[in-house]
Amino acid sequence: MKVGIVGSGMVGSATAYALALLGVAREVVLVDLDRKLAQAHAEDILHATPFAHPVWVRAGSYGDLEGARAVVLAAGVAQRPGETRLQLLDRNAQVFAQVVPRVLEAAPEAVLLVATNPVDVMTQVAYRLSALPPGRVVGSGTILDTARFRALLAEHLRVAPQSVHAYVLGEHGDSEVLVWSSAQVGGVPLLEFAEARGRALSPEDRARIDEGVRRAAYRIIEGKGATYYGIGAGLARLVRAILTDEKGVYTVSAFTPEVEGVLEVSLSLPRILGAGGVEGTVYPSLSPEEREALRRSAEILKEAAFALGF
């Protein structure tokens, strides 16, 4: 099965590398305005496949996306140190106005998987530009934030992160909502499990974990300029869910008719992901404080998209 990636920068190339190592696709096509960059990444990643899986990785044009089941949209400008994801909006919306029509001309049946930041607003932009059913335009959303939340909880509790079920909702960014109230470990409510484990979560512990999740991207960008390994692996996992019709639940961003009274906004909620993209949304139980925080997050994203006319 073929997967396309538009944008061969750090996120696009990391995604291609993760796809190859995990053996998610049989063919990966990298498309970029800088053909030499795309070719260099494709050749380098191809040389890793003898140590992993038989995946054909190559550079191509938009026409080479024909037949792709999923296309990752990673084109855009990089986030600068200290710059919020929403400040990227104007620059990256202009890029998508050129990219989305060309992708759909070549691969009209593909699920569009948006990775460009600010990802929630860019998901809304891609949805409006594409005129596709809303489920076929999926943003990477808070999958990485959710993974960070689970990893930090697991570290505190000294359990495997795979046993932790906790979500980050709303914006992939400053207004994101860590859902503590419905978090579980091995099917046991989080606070109850923590007490039984002898690893109670004090207010200071919760503040430290919240800070660790919320500020992770800023710390990484300050240290090395960009984040790409984590999101590359996350995107590869979403592609696998689409190609295998997995119907797993992921906190991805998609157009949502209404959330907490805010209409027509793209943001992250737990969603069922399969061959057609988003096939359903699971609205979790939230505390009153979490509901209010989610409403505020939705309003921030709604205002940003509205300012662009989307």
UniProtKB/Swiss-Prot annotation:
GO cellular component term of the entry, any: cytoplasm
Binding site for beta-D-fructose 1,6-bisphosphate: R150, Q162, S163, V164, H165, A166, Y167
Binding site for NAD(+): M10, V11, D32, Y62, G76, V77, A115, T116, N117, S140
InterPro entries: L-lactate/malate_DH, L-lactate_DH, L-lactate_DH_AS, Lactate/malate_DH_C, Lactate/malate_DH_N, Lactate_DH/Glyco_Ohase_4_C, NAD(P)-bd_dom_sf
Pfam families xrefs: Ldh_1_C (PF02866), Ldh_1_N (PF00056)
Positions of substrate binding: Q79, R85, N117, P118, V119, D120, D145, T146, A147, R148, T227
Record: active site: H172 (proton acceptor)
Outcome after substituting L46E: Increases the thermal stability of the enzyme. In the absence of fructose 1,6-bisphosphate (FBP), the Q4(R) mutant exhibits a 4-fold increased Vmax value and a 5-fold increase of the affinity for pyruvate
Residues annotated with Phosphotyrosine modification: Y218
Record localization: Cytoplasm
Pathways involved: Fermentation; pyruvate fermentation to lactate; (S)-lactate from pyruvate: step 1/1
Activity control mechanisms: Allosterically activated by fructose 1,6-bisphosphate (FBP). It binds two fructose 1,6-bisphosphate (FBP) molecules per tetramer.
Superkingdom: Bacteria
Catalysed reactions, semicolon-separated: (S)-lactate + NAD(+) = pyruvate + NADH + H(+)
Residue ranges of the TM segments: none
Family: Belongs to the LDH/MDH superfamily. LDH family.
UniProt cross-references to HAMAP family, sorted A to Z: Lactate_dehydrog
Stored NCBIfam families: L-LDH-NAD
Protein name: L-lactate dehydrogenase
